[in-house]
Design a protein with these regions (language model features):
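FabD-like malonyl-/acyl-CoA
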Residues: 1-138, 184, 188, 265-293
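Alpha/beta catalytic cores of group-transfer enzymes, especially the acyltransferase/condensing modules
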Residues: 9-11, 38, 98-246
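Charged catalytic carboxylate motif
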Residues: 26, 67, 169, 205, ...
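Glycine-rich phosphate/pyrophosphate-binding beta-alpha loops
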Residues: 60-62, 193, 248
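Non-catalytic positions within long, well-ordered alpha-helices that form the structural scaffold/packing
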Residues: 76, 178, 259-262
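A short, acidic, amphipathic alpha-helical segment used as a generic capping/interface helix at domain edges
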Residues: 248-263
Length: 293
């Protein structure tokens, strides 16, 4: 079975999407619609050279979403997924590309998500750290022993877990994890503790927007971050999406489940090749590629 997977925040780069805009009338239309929907010219930032402007959460998230979704659209009849998944933000790209959400509704939700997350980060300064070379259980136990908020946020692949929490909590966790034998426990240059209870204000704000959005039947199952299982019911998808901002991204479990369900090849749709690399850590022989024009 063929899967298409969609990257999350961090995959952005200056000039992203310009080739799509220049190559396709459909892409042009979608980018113009995006500028109208967002109320600012995101194409100027995406197609420009200013990496700092692109790093703002309110820009980064819609930019990655647009790159992924428009690339899938430009593929036309070649885009025939039998299963889809997206890492964190990428789940929204996957939902639009598989037909569960309209392009405009998906973009509005992503924009609302980005703004709400930005606000939550400003209200409650916090951070994340990547932990390499320890069993999940060891990391989970150490996190649970710390009195401040520290939780597993992204299960990226075996031996790579990102934790999320208060600045002081992450500081303590990194020290304890290094003592426990982690190959690395490094703070990440992110704006806040994504996928942790500290994102509750953003989750509540996004929930209201999700509630009034129409979700439809899709063309194939989506493997969602909070369950790591194949789901096709629009109402169930909606409920899982509401939990996503404060729950762990179960990406390792998602990859393992897709493979168990008959995955034979995976194509990454959007900027970067991070997800292909993670799949290779689970199954070196798996056929993987990037979607191209």
């Amino acid at each position: 079975m063929k899967a298409y997977v969609f990257p999350g925040q961090g995959a952005q780069f200056p000039g992203m999407g310009k080739d799509l805009y220049e190559a396709s009338a459909d892409a042009k239309k979608m980018f113009k619609k995006a500028n109208e929907t967002l109320g600012f010219s995101i194409t100027n930032i995406m197609f420009g050279e200013d990496a700092e402007a692109l790093k703002q959460t309110k820009v980064t998230q819609p930019a990655i979403f647009l790159h992924s979704v428009i690339l899938a659209k430009v593929k036309g009849d070649y885009f025939k997924p039998e299963m889809v998944a997206g890492h964190s933000l990428g789940e929204f790209s996957a939902l639009v590309s598989a037909g569960y959400l309209s392009f405009e509704d998906g973009l509005k939700l992503v924009s609302k998500r980005a703004m709400a997350m930005q606000k939550a980060c400003e209200q409650n300064p916090s951070t994340m750290a990547a932990v390499l070379g320890l069993e999940n259980e060891v990391v989970e136990n150490i996190c649970s022993e710390i009195e401040e908020v520290v939780v597993p946020a992204n299960y990226n692949c075996p031996g790579q877990l990102v934790i999320s929490g208060s600045n002081n909590g992450i500081e303590i966790a990194c020290k304890k994890l290094t003592e426990a034998g982690a190959r690395r426990a490094l703070k990440l240059p992110v704006g806040g503790a994504f996928h942790s209870p500290l994102m509750e204000p953003a989750r509540a704000e996004l929930e209201t927007a999700i509630d009034i959005t129409e979700f439809k039947e899709g063309v194939c199952p989506i493997y969602q971050n909070v369950t790591a299982t194949a789901i096709t019911n629009p109402e169930e998808i909606k409920e899982n999406l509401k939990k996503q901002l404060t729950a762990s991204v179960m990406w390792t479990q998602t990859m393992q489940q897709m493979i168990a369900d008959g995955l034979s090849s995976v194509t990454e749709v959007g900027p970067g090749k991070v997800l292909q690399g993670l799949f290779k850590k689970v199954d070196r022989k798996l056929e993987s590629s990037s979607a191209t024009l």
